[in-house]
Amino acid sequence: MNKEEWLKKGYVTEPVDKTLDLKTEIDKLRKEKNALILGHYYQSGEIQDIADFVGDSLALAQWAAKTDADIIVMCGVHFMGETAKILCPDKKVLVPDLNAGCSLADSCPADEFAKFVKEHPDHTVISYVNTTAAVKAVTDVVVTSTNAKQIVESFPEDEKIIFGPDRNLGNYINSITGRNMSVSYTHLRAH
């Protein structure tokens, strides 16, 4: 199978020798390549068992930022790998399954979001961390669900704000802060 076929599938589907001890082989490569394996809470137990650290997307990004490993293997979705690369531009970041997507990030096409932002030049743009690097590139502040309220409240009450792409989180922050942020058209379909 050539590289293009692998990329099309998103992962390697070649049969693995049943006599191979995968954990031992992964540990060997981890040491040999100076790699850090990060696993999201949503991963299977087998993936979590071999990960150096298991956590949510924010915790994984924080681990990536402080590692001295040469390679970061992000067992999560695309935006998590992109976030690790933003924080660690000199490191090689690998996402084992190229089909691993996030419905929220996928529901916010960067070109459409950038157009929306351009149509509102007097607005501050706040984006939820679960979004692509391309959306983050047109964002002023990136927030998590834990700090979104605090960040929004740090702006003057009359500040015009676009909040995206999680409409549910944006609407909740509007309701508890009394703000009237422009909440983008996207939302989390299934998580």
Identify what each model region corresponds to:
Residues T186-H191:
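Conserved small/polar residues in nucleotide/adenosyl-binding loops
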Residues K91:
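Carbohydrate-active enzymes and regulators
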Residues V143, N147-K149:
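Donor nucleotide-activated moiety binding/catalytic core segment of transferases
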Residues I151-F155, E159-S175:
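Internal active-site segments that recognize and position negatively charged phosphoryl groups
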Residues N2-T83, L87, P96-D111, K115-I126, ...:
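Metallocofactor- and cofactor-centric catalytic cores in central/energy metabolism, strongly enriched
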